[in-house]
Regions:
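RecA-like helicase/translocase P-loop NTPase motor core
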Residues: 1-275
Length: 275
């Protein structure tokens, strides 16, 4: 369904079961029966969400179920003045301040992991033949690296992920560049719709409370599994509407926004070429 305005671009999900946002525990129970962390179940289970904030929240919730001890890796951060002759911000850019800076695709200053955690690799590592967004499971910790097992390859491999260097501009002005040396991993019990592309997963909970906000988001999310019985959606109560169909198991149905670029549906007609 393609809508032409905010009132008509909603798509119903008539054949999917759902959890509402006040039933988070029920959603987790569906993913992990008895709310017990199961490393094998975690391999084939994922939560998809539209925002990094929602992803971080879900990741923390699931990781807290893992009974293993955690290890914290802190980055080595330095900053360089790039082109600011006035030197306005230099006085306030102490380590405590710039270690709080984060950017998408770059690991945070402090990372906390546990053995059996599911993660994504944030950068391609050609020397290890690892591509960006490869799913891995943590096996063992070392001082400056983490041993992992690859998951989405025909044959799993055991490799050590080292610290690598990231560079990005600071948000308080393009005059400063932060250099961060950190392990290129991020928890992946949950991931954004975009990050899930190319992933095939057995069991998926799709968090639609944030609504898709880009073309193709909904398609990517709902095409990660082969059987709709292994999909549940997580929605706000105001996203439920009466179906108008009697005799259905659910009298209400969740609706989400369908985003389609105008360029995709735009039709150009050459009137001069019409006889």
């Amino acid at each position: 369904m393609i809508g032409i305005d905010e009132d008509t671009c909603k798509v119903g999900l008539p054949n999917l079961e759902y959890f509402t946002s006040d039933a988070t525990n029920d959603a987790i129970e569906w993913l992990y029966p008895n709310k017990e962390f199961n490393p094998k179940a975690a391999l084939d289970t994922v939560i998809l969400a539209s925002t990094n904030e929602a992803v971080d929240k879900w990741n923390k919730t699931i990781q807290d179920m893992n009974p293993k001890d955690s290890k914290i890796y802190k980055s080595r951060d330095t900053f360089d003045e790039v082109d600011d002759e006035k030197d306005i911000l230099k006085s306030i850019l102490n380590p405590k301040v710039y270690k709080s800076f984060n950017r998408n695709g770059i690991p945070t200053h402090e990372l906390e992991f546990k053995v059996d955690d599911i993660c994504l690799v944030l950068r391609s590592l050609p020397s290890l033949d690892i591509a960006t967004n490869t799913r891995v499971q943590i096996v063992e910790f070392f001082e400056h690296s983490i041993k992992v097992k690859t998951l989405n390859e025909p044959k799993s491999r055991y490799i050590c992920i080292p610290r690598i260097t990231f560079k990005f501009r600071l948000p308080y002005g393009e005059s400063y560049q932060l250099t961060r040396v950190q392990i290129p991993l991020r928890l992946a019990y949950a991931m954004t719709f975009n990050k899930s592309q190319s992933q095939t997963i057995h069991k998926v909970l799709i968090d639609c409370t944030g609504e898709p906000f880009a073309h193709g988001h909904a398609y990517v999310a709902f095409s990660r599994v082969r059987d709709c019985k292994n999909v549940r959606v997580f929605v706000n109560k105001d996203q439920l509407h009466e179906t108008g169909i009697r005799g259905r198991e659910f009298e209400q149905m969740p609706f989400i926004t369908n985003i389609v670029y105008q360029e995709v549906i735009k039709v150009e007609i050459d009137y001069d070429g019409i006889d």
